[in-house]
């Protein structure tokens, strides 16, 4: 029997119950499944067991139990727009489940469910109702036998709600659901009645009896091995156990909502806080799995979630990003400790999650500021039941980048309908315009068709570049201009050459293609002097996955189809490529092992001169972290570790711990695994044989390239030596410039810096005197001191310094400085006045006068614009300020 109703204890109780009853415990599978392209996200507990359900004879276990992370946004199941409006909808939720693959069936499933809710959870049987599919008399009789409840508590449902199927064909079967009755003080009717959507009777557990195989013609055939799939929403059962009928009143959501209210300073608008609490949770889990906001697929769904929450933050009139401030509550041990305990990835990715939430919310705020006034203006003229023009919705989407789903959210709150036809008419017109622009096949399409013909005629290229740097080969095809087959290429011609066999690595997996030389040695069965006919290979590309295309310039003589050549790569360049590629693998390993295990590769470039590695991480690496990385790299390189590669099946590679990139597509069989000590990655690139061949390793830069994505650039070997020499040369030049020995450079620079600061302060003092001489006007508007002045020849940074120095809590300072045809305005607003007016509000006012837009925050803002002599900025601002302060 449970003693504590916290969500973490409920989950543990469920898992422990089924583990004691012979079920193997499975951890939650990821939300993003790499091997199931049919799903955007995992949306049910049974997803990771699909193969066992479709072929139970090959299942490696008979029974299983899990608590599964689920996301229902996009695709067939999409709860995004319902979140906040109902008591039970979430984007992210956990599903508790027990599963049988040919072991127990209906009786076992019903008995387990009954024992858990009655004996473990101690629910009153008088509060429980059960539904069965209308023709599933067996389930009806079993519930009656096992529970002893009256017939009236077992309800037959005729709709498809109580019949589950995996798809149009395949395994399927009737369902049975357990409902909890909250009592007659809550509105709602029994399942199957017109009032069933009320909150009184809540489904807490669904048992699916997979007993049929549906054929193409709709015929249901009995499965030889019947299976069980059950699902219990953790949040729903937590609500029951905590005595509330609203999921957002359970301890987890109460903590998140309280954090949202506290951080925003706004305890009104419960709907907004619910949405923020829900969306923080789902966004955090997606980011923890390596997803970043983007414009396509899963990445766009993450962006939609964050942006929808950002819009509700905006409704709270909170100026800063909020979600990243709420997130720490999710991993707080006292508030929502169960998340961090059961899902440690949230802790590991904490910095990344907070960084992405903050950046994405701040970026979208600009869109909200530009687009919402237009929408609000349109809605002012509409009442509940009216229809918003599809043209306006399209304009918001097309011109301002304002998501349609957020527009629909806003008008839903106003009771306004949406002119879908008008919107889609605009969309279709845009698509037609796009079609006209692309009615002719693109160059890329034509090139692909061209190479398909060549592949059918010549076959795939055999690559031998892992084992050797040179080989004899036959010229199969010569292409000029990218789309013209020729029989011969002469001196000066730039051509693409296809061989039957090649040692040249074609650019892929981030690694640049090889360069080198072709020497013709046999033509029309006659041996030739190797130096008479030479082609320089300037790049190697891969087309249609298996054609290695050598981009060449004929340097001497000619090259003909059918020639036998001696193909040799630039060995020194290849060695540098190998060193940088192996160093990239080691860098990935060191980042995960020393910095953050949740780090994921997001891209790479391996050239002969340098390597570039993009990875998911929310904050800049510190100098200490960069030094640690270099030290660990030195240890691995100097350890002379062997670099081993082998080919195996994809499932065996992943099972063996090999890192697979989510963005890459891999074959099921014949994948190549490269191992360097504890580093294992799927990789088709070339590598050193021992790590000592890498030589030295030096990071030359680390920076942000996108939201939540960092980039490291590094050099190895002789390029690292060149880098050290350049740095030494620069240091010597600096020493000469400041006229001290190299060892004293830092001391001298520090002295010069202090002197420079003294001079800057003296200059600021002079400018401050100039401001005072030019005159600062002071007026009292109510209890507010308004200081203002039209200045000349005062730099912007000095105006800002002056304002910061003299700004008090109940003071507003406005300076305007005219230079030729332009004017710069800087305004400061004391913090006690922010509830009525902010510095950025003044910038907006002035923007209409100077035909420009400015920026800043509540305390300090500035704007640069066109000086219009006829417009008195100070008088206009003063007049509007009087109006604001008098309200």
Curated annotation (Swiss-Prot):
Subcellular location: Cytoplasm
One Pfam family linked to the record: tRNA-synt_2c
GO biological process, one term: negative regulation of DNA-templated transcription
Record comment regarding domains: Consists of three domains; the N-terminal catalytic domain, the editing domain and the C-terminal C-Ala domain. The editing domain removes incorrectly charged amino acids, while the C-Ala domain, along with tRNA(Ala), serves as a bridge to cooperatively bring together the editing and aminoacylation centers thus stimulating deacylation of misacylated tRNAs.
Cofactor note: Binds 1 zinc ion per subunit.
GO molecular function, one term: ATP binding
NCBIfam families, alphabetized: alaS
Gene3D superfamilies in alphabetical order: 2.40.30.130, 3.10.310.40, 3.30.54.20, Bira Bifunctional Protein, Domain 2 (3.30.930.10), Threonyl-trna Synthetase, Chain A, domain 2 (3.30.980.10)
Entry keyword set: Aminoacyl-tRNA synthetase, ATP-binding, Cytoplasm, Ligase, Metal-binding, Nucleotide-binding, Protein biosynthesis, RNA-binding, tRNA-binding, Zinc
Listed EC numbers: 6.1.1.7
GO CC field: cytosol
Protein origin, superkingdom: Bacteria
Function: Catalyzes the attachment of alanine to tRNA(Ala) in a two-step reaction: alanine is first activated by ATP to form Ala-AMP and then transferred to the acceptor end of tRNA(Ala). Also edits incorrectly charged Ser-tRNA(Ala) and Gly-tRNA(Ala) via its editing domain.
Binding site for Zn(2+): 581, 585, 683, 687
The protein, known as: Alanine--tRNA ligase
Entry keyword Oxidoreductase: no
Cofactor(s) listed: Zn(2+)
Reactions the enzyme catalyzes: tRNA(Ala) + L-alanine + ATP = L-alanyl-tRNA(Ala) + AMP + diphosphate
